[in-house]
């Protein structure tokens, strides 16, 4: 698997873990709160663990000075997910920041 694909997958898994944690805090049906929390926190651990393993393989191939800034993709994924899944409001400034992050990632990625 390409190291760049691994990097994107590691980022997506990290974000999935964060989103599962958010979902664990959401209301659930009465009497099912403990099961709800345990399920989503378990999913978070699974996603974060798999993301970490992929991240380790990325670090074997790419200098950390290049790889780590690429994780700023997480801000993009989480913003899109919060807006799309939970309909969280996102201000124009926030969208501008997300756009600048994407531009920075493209510049960094093409400099390798």
UniProtKB/Swiss-Prot annotation:
Keywords: Cell inner membrane, Cell membrane, Lipid A biosynthesis, Lipid biosynthesis, Lipid metabolism, Lipopolysaccharide biosynthesis, Membrane, Transmembrane, Transmembrane helix, Transport
InterPro entries: EamA_dom, Flippase_ArnE, Small_drug/metabolite_transptr
GO cellular component labels: plasma membrane
One Pfam entry name: EamA
An example Gene Ontology biological process: lipid A biosynthetic process
Transmembrane parts of this sequence: 37-57, 66-86, 89-109
Localization, UniProt: Cell inner membrane
Annotated pathway: Bacterial outer membrane biogenesis; lipopolysaccharide biosynthesis
Superkingdom field: Bacteria
Molecular-function GO terms, alphabetical: carbohydrate derivative transmembrane transporter activity
Ranges for domain EamA: 35-110
Membrane topology category: Multi-pass membrane protein
Function: Translocates 4-amino-4-deoxy-L-arabinose-phosphoundecaprenol (alpha-L-Ara4N-phosphoundecaprenol) from the cytoplasmic to the periplasmic side of the inner membrane.
Sequence similarity: Belongs to the ArnE family.
Record note on quaternary structure: Heterodimer of ArnE and ArnF.
Protein name: Probable 4-amino-4-deoxy-L-arabinose-phosphoundecaprenol flippase subunit ArnE
Gene: arnE
């Amino acid at each position: 698997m390409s190291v760049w694909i691994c990097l994107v997958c590691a980022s997506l898994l990290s974000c999935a873990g964060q989103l599962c944690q958010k979902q664990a805090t959401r209301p659930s049906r009465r009497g099912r709160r403990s099961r709800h929390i345990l399920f989503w926190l378990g999913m978070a651990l699974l996603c974060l663990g798999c993301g970490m393993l992929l991240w380790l393989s990325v670090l074997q191939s790419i200098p950390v000075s290049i790889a780590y800034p690429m994780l700023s993709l997480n801000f993009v994924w989480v913003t899109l997910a919060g807006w799309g899944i939970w309909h969280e409001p996102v201000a124009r400034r926030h969208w501008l920041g997300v756009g600048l992050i994407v531009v920075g990632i493209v510049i960094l990625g093409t400099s390798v």
